[in-house]
């Protein structure tokens, strides 16, 4: 095998399978492996083109006659908190997030297992074991971090950390943060914790001087994915490039990035 063939990504197409988001549709994905010294650069490039990462695989939808999955990224430094977002932050004022190495723990898995059992018991990840979870976190050749969200415990006499409430697995890209997967204690559902973690990532991107937070795929009409369209202004990937959607919901112009 030549050096050129090792460095050039090979792309593959999956067989059709039932769509997990829209009824009576099937999905196909195109994917490649993210390995080697240039995995980070390739992940950056592919993310800009609408790919997502899962372990050491980068993939994007390649469905026949369907383009419902739209890659979205929030424009972090222009994002303005709505009244609803401020209420979410207020409900989670007792929570602090800590950036850590991508190392799985049994505490994380307990929350992950409860989250799947409560909210995604029939999904494709429903049967994941603790070893599967460890692979999801550790099998990465790019810059990946874990953010643990805990109740504030700094004032406790025993100096122990507060209870773990949520976790985000996040890639650090050259131009933003990419939320690979996030989950939370389902008993805390009144906190709107998924929204809170996105708001926290927007704040972190600003602090790091990164322009975007990549949320994955927005799917209009899908209860599971439609919420991603609420974080405005954002950019949505169209066949002609990234399109800006302003806070009023109007598409204003096409970006050149």
From Swiss-Prot:
It is found in: Cytoplasm. Its EC number is 2.3.2.29. It is an enzyme of class 2 (transferase). GO terms for biological process: ubiquitin-dependent protein catabolic process via the N-end rule pathway. GO terms for cellular component: cytoplasm. Its main location: cytoplasm. Keywords: Acyltransferase, Cytoplasm, Transferase. It catalyses: N-terminal L-glutamyl-[protein] + L-leucyl-tRNA(Leu) = N-terminal L-leucyl-L-glutamyl-[protein] + tRNA(Leu) + H(+); N-terminal L-aspartyl-[protein] + L-leucyl-tRNA(Leu) = N-terminal L-leucyl-L-aspartyl-[protein] + tRNA(Leu) + H(+). SUPFAM superfamilies: Acyl-CoA N-acyltransferases (Nat). GO terms for molecular function: arginyl-tRNA--protein transferase activity; leucyl-tRNA--protein transferase activity. The keyword Transferase applies. InterPro entries: Acyl_CoA_acyltransferase, Asp_Glu_LeuTrfase, N-end_Aminoacyl_Trfase, N-end_Aminoacyl_Trfase_C, N-end_Aminoacyl_Trfase_N. It comes from the Bacteria. The keyword Cytoplasm applies. Belongs to the R-transferase family. Bpt subfamily. NCBIfam families: PRK01305.1-3, PRK01305.1-4, PRK01305.2-3. Functions in the N-end rule pathway of protein degradation where it conjugates Leu from its aminoacyl-tRNA to the N-termini of proteins containing an N-terminal aspartate or glutamate. This is Aspartate/glutamate leucyltransferase. It comes from Nitrobacter winogradskyi (strain ATCC 25391 / DSM 10237 / CIP 104748 / NCIMB 11846 / Nb-255). The lineage of its organism: Bacteria, Pseudomonadati, Pseudomonadota, Alphaproteobacteria, Hyphomicrobiales.
